[in-house]
Amino acid sequence: MKRTEVFLEIVAKKKGCMLCDLAIAILEEIAPEFGEGVLRWEVVDVGAREGLRRFDELTEICSRRPAVPSIIINEIIAFDNIPDMEALSAAVREALSKKV
């Protein structure tokens, strides 16, 4: 059975982070391509206590520290930067094609 949802985490410092805003804008731009409810995302704000906790969890899950900024797809580091729309869209399609 293939995935029906992709969960992305944007690892960034949220306050005043232009790259974080860019990543969200790109996600909002490509989301309609996949249909409603397929893409979910959250910002892991390394400038906040809760974000640092999740950052530590992701470091353990991914077996390495995610770069700041980076994009994690279904708990796998997909990009150590903010990709363009085409690259992110392709990565989401690949994640959807994987079996659950």
Positions of predicted regions on the chain:
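Generic recognition of short, well-ordered alpha-helical segments
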Residues: 21-25, 53, 83
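Thioredoxin-like thiol-disulfide oxidoreductase module
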Residues: 40-66
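Local sequence-structure signature of Cys/Sec-based thiol-disulfide redox active-site neighborhoods
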Residues: 1-35
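Residue-level recognition of the N-termini of beta-strands and the immediately preceding loop/turn
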Residues: 6, 39-41, 69
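Non-catalytic, surface beta->alpha helical segment in thiol-disulfide oxidoreductase systems
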Residues: 67, 72-100
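Conserved short-loop catalytic and cofactor-binding motifs
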Residues: 11, 15, 43, 76
